[in-house]
């Protein structure tokens, strides 16, 4: 309501109001009429609506002629009001239908009665209740008068995106809606505000969206936004897709495994780091094929994403591409070697797209494409990605080919004005590596010396940047590429620090002369072209005909390289190609090996304090001419090993010391062709003016001068501050040199003495690489990980004819011989040799498969070298990088592992687990359980760590995935499974295509021909997959089987060498998915495939019966849980061990099958188990394959001698090398061996994974093997010997379980122990009582030791207790029963000889183990044990139980029995009970307990006095009295046997019988005690089992309780609702009453009114009465008035 002249008027009166309000004097005017507003039925309420507006408004507001479609700022109140009061235009402006997701900036006018404008397709922030949109309402004033109403909402995805609706208070139907994304730069304080602000939303919101939906939402929001992530000089383009990708990464519900905490850098810290997609380590191998696109912008260059804005075409004068080209339909050279590859568009460096609408200029400062973090970025040059030539790009050295048009290109570099032509149309200046659209040329334009683009090596530009003489006005150029931590951690470049960048390239003008004269600058003087191959068409290798590297006047002492060429077929050799570029990106087939090229290398000038580091650049030289390297003896330059002869491609490893005088001349003597010499600089940051001699022993100190922590100036080629470099390398002249100063080129050249570095031959005679769409596979073969100071670039290409080591003339020798140097990496069987700088900085390994080159040098063995030198190998890759805390996940680790023995182990945070070599270069282990967090992972050989450490992550489960939700885990809809199967197969096909491609490259390399790669590998299979996906019926399985068989037939699987880091569906492999779907045929096909290509890593990962998913479920677990009988049987028969692997809740497959009602399945598997055990029992009696005895010189024994802590091996411990082929594991099994020796302090690893002893078949064989090793008797092993010896759990006792208290469980038998490199006691059959091994336990000097827990404090917390799964059906009584039954039903007592031997050894052991105080003559028992204190009756009762038990259990043999036993020969039948495995009495294979060894007894006895033993278990221990009694018995037995041993028994039969009888009673007492000991162990195991069972039971109980709680809540809610219903009933009653009352009132009023009316009618004709009053009362009567 508006007040006019003291009267209140209706706000929007719909009727014509009489014109009693005049504009002249009033505050409010009747404004223009509004067009009629129709109601819903289309009826116009009236002709026009008059609106009263404040007069002030009309005076101050102009009328608007038009409503802008877009405005990228908020309107002022005055502007809004002006639009809203321009009524006459509204009809023209109104939008009649709601727009879906209007773009950022849109301004739209709606009529709210006709259009539901709020349904605009965006997702707006909701209130806490989640139902209504969160709106802010406010009234806005214009000229102090409130006249506008505003309603604001903001996006729930990007909080900076708003929708604001405005309307006039007087005319609320017309609404002006404005959409705007307001990057709050002032809030963020960062130039990259919009993105930073955008990401602070909650994860829940993101979880709802797919990537496509997000892009749909975000594209319009970011329309027209120009982000400048700039530090003043530069800005960089950005796209919505990248933002979405980054947001999804930052909000992933299950984050990808991260190998480290990310430190994304760039010069701007947060600004550039936002877009860092950091799970790149995972995708190192399979790189996406990126099509470089052309672009020819004049003024700007853009690096944009593929589809940033669809359909917006800006006219551009340099357009040379069409959309088809952009989308990759036109094949172009893809010369990208990605270090990190994501299948989504990570690392795509794309040349600008001319059809892009909003150009963003880029400059040398930053990556323009946020996903390019791993790739060198375009430095100050426009659409040509020329960084690759601009300065030794160490980051995965990419050569970018782009198409050059004739347009001029501008640099945005800070040193030049925006219009400075870096590459002018005639290519007269600057340096650009480009491919022109027609002729694919490498152009090296000539440069003037003054304004040329100087290519400074890193340390030079550092000196330029940081030296005091630097020209004050010059802007320090930013780093040319972003630092990628993944790349750094896994592939650090030479001398790189964490956070350092790559080379800088800058426009160097003449005033560089003022900087210290330390650089070598290279200028190219002319241009030459020839062809390189790409795909099937070859593009020519182009090169400067005569490219003289001329040093600019700046360098007093800079060397100038002159590159002259007589012919036309030179190699492209821009100064910036880094080592990997040389081989990976170039096609050498076009090299004409008969032309002569001359090149002179001369050093011009000298300076006393220069440390020269040549930048990595090539120069070509003539083979026949000497190449003089002159060194000024007065200068401190060290050009050691400046040039070497290399028949085809050369590397020059030049390392420098701070002072090295001497004249070195190196001659080239060679007959062959082209030499590509590479200056491989090491860019060690020298101290500022170079005067300092580097005496430091840590690289860090030298670098700190230049690397100021605050500013991430990426100095040179990234210094790598590495703690491991201990010590400096001294040069020949005695001057210390940091290890990182030693730079090796393409070869592992170690340089302990720097007089000259030796070199390796790199022969590329038959080396042909074609660039096809399979390019990445080629690169796979070249992937090499560089580490640390003194890095060696590990590409080793050796061919037979050129394997001579050329020696520099001053005779400095390389520290390694030719044979050591030439280990080819081509065949996986041979170790890549790894050398490192003399003091042992880590170096590099790479597998290279070039030609099938084989060298005898491999015999030397990489590991042999390593053992002697004590150096460290690099882990080149490992997958996966993470696990949940339960562990058990299979981890594959690649590196130079070659020894085919089982002596490898992996250390996860010092927890050792055994590893096995599944093929040369690939180790497999299963990670142990561990707390969450990052841990180090290292490889050990013979318990000595031989690898660098990499980071492995244990992740906590996100709350929704905690094990309680696992009750729903083992169920999924079929479609999801099927889709996943197809996805996995597609991944494998992609791998196959890559591998096929790379193999074709390799085959083609033999002839040096065209080498066209073929990507057709995957075609057929994919078609199959597609059709499979189409018909997801019963034939789905058969279709998948067909696909698998097709893939299986390809040979490439055998050659797969690299780990795949594919994203799995919930951690499930192909085998998991097949099992979950019950596809038995598919499973059999996969098994065939796996056996056919046993070495394939891909299949190792995809098809492994013991691998577990994210909830520790094996494929067998899935099959059991979902009731697939056939699949379960196939899986069980393939690998039985899977049946004992529990899931993360500790449930076993059979248990789950039962609980889910698949009883038949459970029974079937149990039946299979029983059958097997019965067969094993019989088989083990008969077959005992004898095994050979090893020679004492076996390396295992040697190692044993070294590893023992005392120098000599204790008596009786012999090392057995495993010569038995049975001991070589089949591929599908995880490694069976735990190495205990050396890791005693580490917690035991998770046991249920590597379950050696559940695999009984092999075990029985091993047992036999072990039994056949003869040894007359076991020597005493003194309990006092400090040598720890492993405890062997006897195969029959313990039913293949793990004893939890002992050290990490040891292998099942002596023979397998031998292969696990442990000391082993040889057994003879006599030492076995019913086939149980003697058990050794660590003794301690007093002889009263108990087995030390392996770091007791650590074992228990680290391990889940769900491990003792095999024992879950056994109860102690069964063993008692079995024992009693067996002893009662034995027809024949043991032959006396064996009783003698057993009792003798038993007595010996007992006497040996008895504590000294009990042996003393004046024996006084200790204060009674806790047990006796509490209940003295217990012991006596146990003793009486013992007595009665002995009476029942065994009838003593009569003399006749004894006589027959002595007279009869040992027949097999009488000896049956002695057979090693015993008779299969019980299904669980419980045997009569063993006669424990001395060490066992000492454990048992000392447990009696141990205070730690719980009182319940104390009943199982012996009191002092019992111990004394036992000791006396043992002595008696000993003396009796000694007395009667040698005499003829016939004479003294009677006497002997009596003595033996007496001893036998004692002996049985002893066996009972042995039994008691076994029971003691069993009970502890049972306790552990009960505990684990209780845990899973408790989990279930909790789950049920939560269900109950939910039900209760539901009930409460229902009853509450009912109450609620009752209340409204009451309310209605009240309302009815009130209505009645009011109706009574109105009746009374009516009556009164009628009376008045009657009176008035009577008076109608009276002149006194006013007729108007009468009319009014009439209206009142009709109810129209009040």
From Swiss-Prot:
PROSITE patterns from the UniProt entry: ANK_REP_REGION (PS50297), ANK_REPEAT (PS50088), CG_1 (PS51437), IQ (PS50096)
Keyword Cell cycle belongs to the record: no
ANK repeats by residue range: 1066-1095, 1111-1141, 1145-1174
Biased composition range(s): Basic and acidic residues: 302-327
Region of interest: Disordered: 284-375, 599-622, 992-1020, 1217-1249, 1267-1318
GO cellular component, one term: nucleus
Biased composition, class Polar residues, residue ranges: 337-367, 599-618, 1268-1291
Family the entry assigns: Belongs to the CAMTA family.
PANTHER family tied to this protein: CALMODULIN-BINDING TRANSCRIPTION ACTIVATOR 1, CALMODULIN-BINDING TRANSCRIPTION ACTIVATOR CAMTA
Quaternary structure, from the entry: May interact with calmodulin.
Name the UniProt record assigns to this protein: Calmodulin-binding transcription activator 1
Organism: Mus musculus
Gene designation per UniProt: Camta1
